[in-house]
Amino acid sequence: MLRFFLACTLLFPCLANAGSDINPASCQRIAMGPGPDDMHLQSLAVPRLIISSHDRRHFRNHGNLYALPLDSLKAGIMARTGEPDGFTLRPHGLDLTQRDGRWWLYVINHDKELFSDQHTLVIYEVVGDTLIFQQELHSPLLTAPNDVAVADNGDIYVTNEREDGASIAEFLFLQRKANVVVYRPQLGWRIAADDLAVANGILIQGNTVWITQTLGEGLRRYQRTSDGRLTQMAQLGNLSLLDSITVRDNGHFLIPAYPSLPNFLLHWQLPGQRSPTKIYDVDPQTGQGSVIFADSGRTISAVSTALAIKDQLYLGQIFDAFVLRCPLPQ
């Protein structure tokens, strides 16, 4: 996500503002920790969001995982138990799954340095308001992980923004080396797909896998093979500068984008500077999208996740310390 921006800031023009279905002035801020980048709905008697939080302006700081009940809208840090000595959590992308009545949370966990190849994937069981540590997966293939998604058979897919997480050259020259890796307990980690331009969001629907790219154009669609590899790639549409991907009730996708990379960089370094954002409603049949939310950055900057729940839209972001809740026209 944010790792590539320094290199590409001067290479892309700012995109023009577009109209939207949602008036940002109608939205409500919900306070929590900095950088609530990713979120997933846990469907309980009282539904709640589980949200990753990390201060990416001070990357070495530890982060937290929050629970946000949708009735009270009061976020709280989730307790964590069983973590090994010396463990530090700097969460990024998440996936939340339910199997046999038990909930499992998969968390991209970053090293203390922005440019590093020492990242991991952490698995917790969610029991009430507590996260019980289960496993931390290490691999040299977790080079610059961004997002994670788990298939029905337990295969774990992770998007990497770069092939070499410690490579500044790959960053500066915008080399098309990003990939998706897959983990299966019997086989370990392997590359599932490559030749991506900053692989970002990932969504699995049965044997179909969707990938967003931040530098590459269009939404990518793949088919899973029996060994977990991704084949039959199709590129749909021409949207670019994309982040995560979620599904609406109508089957369309919600995908945030960054209209101005120079403003994003300024916002990263100077909190008072604003960074515009857009949310696309994307037809998965064509990859074409319409803007349902656009903001100059005055209401929220650098949205990274958009999640629709009934008639409300919840927006996470990369840096600032709140989630935005907006009425969603039906």
Regions of interest found by a model, annotated:
Residues G19-G35, A75-A79, G287-D295:
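A short helix->beta-strand "capping" segment at the edge of beta-propeller domains
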Residues G63-R99, L105-D111:
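Blade-loop segments of beta-propeller domains
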Residues G86-H92, W103-D152, R162-A166:
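Asp-box/WD-like beta-propeller blade repeats and closely related beta-sheet repeat scaffolds
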Residues N238-V291:
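Loop/turn-rich, solvent-exposed surfaces of beta-rich toroidal or solenoidal domains
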Residues I51-N61, V107-F115, V158-R176, I255-R274:
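Short, conserved, GDST-rich strand-edge loop motifs in beta-rich repeat architectures
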Residues G63-D71, Q118-V127, F173-P185, Q273-Q285:
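Beta-propeller blade signature
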Residues A302-Q330:
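Blade-level signature of beta-propeller repeat domains, shared across WD40, Kelch, NHL, RCC1
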Residues G33-V46, N61, E83-Q98, S139-I156, ...:
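Beta-rich, blade/repeat-based domains predominating
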